[in-house]
Amino acid sequence: MAKMELSKAFSGQRTLLSAILSMLSLSFSTTSLLSNYWFVGTQKVPKPLCEKGLAAKCFDMPVSLDGDTNTSTQEVVQYNWETGDDRFSFRSFRSGMWLSCEETVEEPALLHPQSWKQFRALRSSGTAAAKGERCRSFIELTPPAKREILWLSLGTQITYIGLQFISFLLLLTDLLLTGNPACGLKLSAFAAVSSVLSGLLGMVAHMMYSQVFQATVNLGPEDWRPHVWNYGWAFYMAWLSFTCCMASAVTTFNTYTRMVLEFKCKHSKSFKENPNCLPHHHQCFPRRLSSAAPTVGPLTSYHQYHNQPIHSVSEGVDFYSELRNKGFQRGASQELKEAVRSSVEEEQC
């Protein structure tokens, strides 16, 4: 009895561990899906022409239009001292499955009149422009040939989260219904299958989106193409979610297999310990089993029953407790009948 209680405690701990891993996987996958930090990097954007805010880096050069030295026919041309990469500004960007946001720099000439006071404060602190952020739909940035793959990736990701939620609910129900081993066995089986399917779908979704992003980097709009990019924290969180999902599936499968082996072992021992139930074996089974497999006659040996196939493990779990109780009851009643019969024979003698 102590061994059985210890086994139930270990099974409950494994189910709890699977539920915790499933909950972590569900939270990580949902966060990564809604995040815009799958990929981060910088964009190389040409700086605007010489304006008031950049006058220190520009100089004027008068150029005659008709070759004459007359100042009335001369035009002033502005030149910039900056060369090479100094002519470009590097702005950060971040991209996710839904939106792609990039840093913008608003020049002084484009500022609203009400923003001049704010611009003077920025200029006094050494900042030449007001920084902001512009977000665009990543679906619009994706090349038309890759949009179907992106939609498929989004659908697979949502299905991945849905299966994770179902698996978590099944494991939570298994924890609440600890008194019914047959129901717990079925819930563990469905939860394990759901976790494995969700993990495979999540892996496919992550790989498809990565391919779509790389194609967008090469074939997307020129004003969006990043100069340097790398993976963001949402990308790593998505794969961490996949790892937790598969760990939950392995733990649930381990719990299911252990329960199956325990019930088979107990089922075999019950017939070894109670041979009186063997001649009435067909009466010990539930009606669904006796109707499915008609009995030819009473069984005379344990091996004759032991070689018969069991229709399902869950059915064996359902009738196991009933089988054991009936075996003990039949054994006690048989002993009582023999005692009464022997006493009657002695009185007749």
From Swiss-Prot:
Show which residues constitute the signal peptide: none
Q: Is Transmembrane found in the keyword set?
A: yes
Q: Which InterPro entries match?
A: GSG-1, PMP-22/EMP/MP20-like
* Task of the protein: May cause the redistribution of PAPOLB from the cytosol to the endoplasmic reticulum.
State the source organism's domain of life.
Answer: Eukaryota
What PANTHER family does the entry give? EPITHELIAL MEMBRANE PROTEIN-RELATED, GERM CELL-SPECIFIC GENE 1 PROTEIN
What is annotated about its quaternary structure and interactions? Interacts with PAPOLB.
> Which UniProt keywords are present, listed alphabetically?
Endoplasmic reticulum, Membrane, Transmembrane, Transmembrane helix
Q: Its encoding gene is what?
A: GSG1
Q: What is this protein called?
A: Germ cell-specific gene 1 protein
Write out the similarity annotation. Answer: Belongs to the GSG1 family.
> Which ranges does the record mark as transmembrane?
20-40, 158-178, 189-209, 233-253
> What does the record say about its membrane topology?
Multi-pass membrane protein
From the Swiss-Prot or TrEMBL record, state where the protein is found. Endoplasmic reticulum membrane
One GO cellular component term: plasma membrane
